[in-house]
């Protein structure tokens, strides 16, 4: 046997890791119109994943770094699941999405280990955590390599928290009928207990993706932030997303009187995208425990119930929805029927009067969240505020919108 053949035999993978785009087997819609959204990025020809530059830059990644990693993926001549899609390289090797972003994360992890300045080291660890999360994106169930990247992200995040300003505590919450879940409580400088925002994130993000929100908007106002992962991902991976989408967050809310660092009489919820579905449910079901609920680009009715709206949404996002619902090989018709049950209007909540103050921010022509969803939320509240966020310039208006939202929350908490 030649040396080359021997090497191939010795280092031949024992099994192939599933490639991300193959994990959800739905009937495709075919050609789709291009999509651009402030919170979700945009569809780019020849990419399975939506490229979410705004949010990645907002989380601290340099635009040039994003382009460098994308270039490595594009230039790979390795085998792909779909030759027309750059980010479908099979196996953990050069050109594979998870491999390239995790490799980039390791560069920053090494910088963090070598850096003697604790605060700068913390910044490098945070950068690595963010890159590992991008490696795992969009966090589909059963993506073994992505789950390993998520674990590395959580480890890097814990290292970062030990070195950055303020205090972070990892907390475990008991949920009857299943496994406990883990959350992170971020606390500003000073003496607690602190007014606290319970973060309800999007379905394609991890709880560790929201440090920028805490550092830039809540901490300067003396507000703590508590995060948990959405059902079926991260530390909540043993829980499936159900129509009772707020189940985990409700149990966390009920546990807050026993958390000494949290002023449980001054708690608000903040929901991004599908996280707004959770936050608005909390506004109705746990109104005595909440001072306010804020939403950004909420997914509470139209996308869940309108077939035309669903047709405008990229394949990747529908795959995320199917994955969270545990419908990996369901037909599109079955998925549509199930999604309809998650509409808060269909559930009989939205449209009824809600005593909790609610704000909802939206962008015009948002394919995921039309203005009507935000109007439905704010008109249902006894104290509602509707906030339109202009699209361009996208980064500046995103920051301005978050400043206004956190200011609104502060007035109701402090």
From Swiss-Prot:
Family matches, as SUPFAM superfamilies: alpha/beta-Hydrolases
Protein function: Catalyzes the hydrolysis of esters.
Enzyme nomenclature, EC number: 3.1.1.1
Protein name: Esterase FrsA
Native source species: Escherichia coli O139:H28 (strain E24377A / ETEC)
An annotated Gene Ontology molecular function: carboxylesterase activity
Catalytic activity reported: a carboxylic ester + H2O = an alcohol + a carboxylate + H(+)
Gene: frsA
InterPro entries: AB_hydrolase_fold, FrsA, FrsA-like, FrsA_esterase
Assigned protein family: Belongs to the FrsA family.
Keyword presence, Hydrolase: yes
Keywords: Hydrolase, Serine esterase
Pfam family name, one: FrsA-like
Domain of life of the source: Bacteria
């Amino acid at each position: 046997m030649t040396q080359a053949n021997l090497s191939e035999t010795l280092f031949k993978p024992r099994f192939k890791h599933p490639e991300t785009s193959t994990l959800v087997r739905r009937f495709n819609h075919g050609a789709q119109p291009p999509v651009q959204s402030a919170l979700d990025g945009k569809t780019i020809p020849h990419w399975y994943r939506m490229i979410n530059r705004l949010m990645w830059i907002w989380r601290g990644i340099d635009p040039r770094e994003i382009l460098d990693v994308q270039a490595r993926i594009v230039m790979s001549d390795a085998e792909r699941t779909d030759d027309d899609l750059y980010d479908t390289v099979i196996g953990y090797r050069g050109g594979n999405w998870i491999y390239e972003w995790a490799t980039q994360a390791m560069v920053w992890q090494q910088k963090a280990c070598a850096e003697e300045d604790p605060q700068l080291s913390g910044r490098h660890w945070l950068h690595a955590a963010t890159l590992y999360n991008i490696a795992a994106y969009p966090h589909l169930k059963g993506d073994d390599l992505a789950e390993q990247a998520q674990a590395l992200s959580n480890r890097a995040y814990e290292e970062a928290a030990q070195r950055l300003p303020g205090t972070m505590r990892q907390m475990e919450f008991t949920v009857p009928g299943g496994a406990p879940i883990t959350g992170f409580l971020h606390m500003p400088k000073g003496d607690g207990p602190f007014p606290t925002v319970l973060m309800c994130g999007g379905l394609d993000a991890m709880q560790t993706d929201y440090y920028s929100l805490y550092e830039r908007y809540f901490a300067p106002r003396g507000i703590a932030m508590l995060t948990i992962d959405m059902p079926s991902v991260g530390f909540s991976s043993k829980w499936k997303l159900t129509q009772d989408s707020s189940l985990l967050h409700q149990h966390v809310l009920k546990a807050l009187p026993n958390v000494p660092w949290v002023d449980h009489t001054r708690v608000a919820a903040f929901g991004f995208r599908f996280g707004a579905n959770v936050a608005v449910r909390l506004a109705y079901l746990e109104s005595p425990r909440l001072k306010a609920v804020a939403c950004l680009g909420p997914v509470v009715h139209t996308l869940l119930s309108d077939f035309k709206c669903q047709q405008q949404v990229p394949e990747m996002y529908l795959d995320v929805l199917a994955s969270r619902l545990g419908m990996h090989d369901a037909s599109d018709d079955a998925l549509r029927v199930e999604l309809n049950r998650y509409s808060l209007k269909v559930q009989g909540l939205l449209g009824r009067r809600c005593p909790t103050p609610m704000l909802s921010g939206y962008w015009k022509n948002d394919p995921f969240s039309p203005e009507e969803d935000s109007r439905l939320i704010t008109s249902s509240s006894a104290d509602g505020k509707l906030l339109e966020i202009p699209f361009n310039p996208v980064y500046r208006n995103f920051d301005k919108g978050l400043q206004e939202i956190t200011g609104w929350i502060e007035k109701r908490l402090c």
